[in-house]
C-alpha cells in the first residue's frame, strides 16, 4: 500500500466491512504520492500556468466509484470533476471497474509548494484520500529588461562530441580552431541533465517538452502526463511556453525543422499527445489550435500528413486522429477544437484559406510574402540531409541510385537549407506586434547518428550552426532577443577517437583488402598520430569533400553492429517514413548499417545494443545562451529549469547580472 494513501474507511451498518477503494495513479506526478517522500518536487509550474489534475481509482470488488473531488492545500478545486470508468478504453492491466477522475485546466498564482489531494467515494460510502505535491515557481524581481523574442535552436541528438566534430571539420591548426562555430561564441554555457519522467534515457518527445513546459513527460509523450486510457489525445495536459506567452502576452510561435513536422521535436512545442506517432491528429492540432499557440510559421517536411487520403503520398488515417464531443471538459476548459475523424481533409488548402503562404520548394520560399503567416512543406516526410542537399546543389556528386543525385531520387531537388529556413522564419515573425517564440531544429544530427553515418551528421551539425549564426545576427541587431542552443539528448555515444594515418586513396585500397588488420590496425591514429585533419571549406560553407587524406575518425559507444571502412557513405540509409520508400529508386537504398556498400570491407564493429541503430544516451548535453538573460544559463541544470529561465526573461525580465552579449554583432569567420 502506498504510504500516502489515507484510507477513510467507514464501517457499514453491521460493522462487517473495512475495505476501501485504492488510488492507483495521481497526476501531476509526485514523489509524495509514489514513495511518501516530499522531495524532490517533480511537477513545477509558473504562476497561472494551466495543468490538469487526474486520479485513477480502483473500487472494491462489486463496487463503483460514484464521486470524487480534488483539493489544493485543503481547499476544494472549484471546477467540474469528470468521472469515467475503464469498462472500455483503458490500457492493459487496468481493472475495468477503475474510475478516472479529471479536472481540466487548473492553475495557481500562489508561489511555493502545494499539497493536492483527491477524495474518492464508492457506492457503499467507503472513501479514499491520496496526496501529492507540486510547486509554483515564482517570478523574481528583474535586474534588466524583458526579452521580446525567444529563439530555441535544438540540435537533435547533438552532444559535446557532435559539436566538437563540426568544429574540427571547420578547421584546426596547432590546437586552435581556425573558424569557431557560431554556437562557440555564445556568452554563457551550461550542462543539461536530460532524463525523462520514466527513464534516465529520454527520447526526443520529453527531451523537447521539458524545455517548453517545465515538466517531465514519459518517453513518446508530448505536453501531457501519463494516464491509464488508450486515447492518445485525452491525457492530462500541461501548458506550453508558446501557449502561456500567447495567452498572457500575445506572442506568436514559429516552428522550423529539417524533420517531418509531425516529429517529436516540432510537435513538442504545440501539440498534446501520448503518441508521438499519431501524425494525422498531430498536424490537425497544429492548425486547429493555432489560436492557443499563436502558430504563425511552420516549416519542414511532412507533406504526407497534409494531403487528403487517397492522394499519392498521403498518410492521413482516422486511426491516428481524434474527435471529442463539444461538451467534453477538454474542449470547454482548455478551449481546444473538438477535432473530427477527417482523413480526407486537405490541410494545405485550409492553411492557405486561413491566410498562410504555402511554400513546397526553396524557390517558393524565397518568394513568400514575409508579412503573411507561412507554411513550408519541402518533403513528403523528413527532408534530405545537408550532405545530400549540398551535393545536389553543386551537381558534382551523382551519388543517387538512379543516375542523378540523392535529392533527385527523392524527387525533391529544390529543398532549402536550415539557415535559409531560419532566415525566412525570422523575417516573418519579426512582424509580430508582441514578439515571438521560435524553435529551430537540426533534426538529422540525431537521425544520422542513429544510422552511425558520421559524415552526414557532421555536415548536419554545420548546417545547424549556420542557422545558429542567422539567429545570433538577428539577436545582435535587435538587442531584445534571447537565443539558446542546446540538444534534447545525445545520440550514439559518439567519440572522436583520432585521425586516419593514411590518405583517402590508401584507405580505399585497405578497404578492398578487408578485415581488422587493415581497417583498424593500419588506419586508426590516436594521440599525436591523429594530427589535425584538414577539410577544405568551399564558398557554400561546407567541405569540398569529406573524403580527405588523414581524416577525422569517429567511434560510437551506443552502437549497433556495423561494418566500417571510415569513408563517406555513398547514400543515406532508406528512410522508411517516406511514403514511396518501397518503390524504386528509394527501395534500393540500404536498410541498415550492415547492408551498406562498405560492408564489403568486412571490418565488423560489434555493437553494445540490440537492433540495427545506435541509440540515445543519458549523457548531459551542452547549452549555450546569447542575448539579454544569457547569464542565467550556467552550471549544471535540469532540462525543466530552462523553461523557467526563459519565462522569467520574457514575463518579468532579466535576473542575472546585466550583460551586453546581444548588443554587438559577432564577427563572421574569415576564409
Outline where the language-model segments fall.
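Short, compositionally biased P/S/T/A/G/V-rich stretches that sit at domain boundaries
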Residues: 18-47
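Gram-negative bacterial Sec-dependent N-terminal signal peptides
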Residues: 1-19
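Aromatic sugar-binding surface patches on proteins
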Residues: 86-103
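Aromatic/hydrophobic beta-strand junction motif of beta-rich domains
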Residues: 51-61
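A post-motif C-terminal structural segment
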Residues: 86-91, 148, 155-209, 218, ...
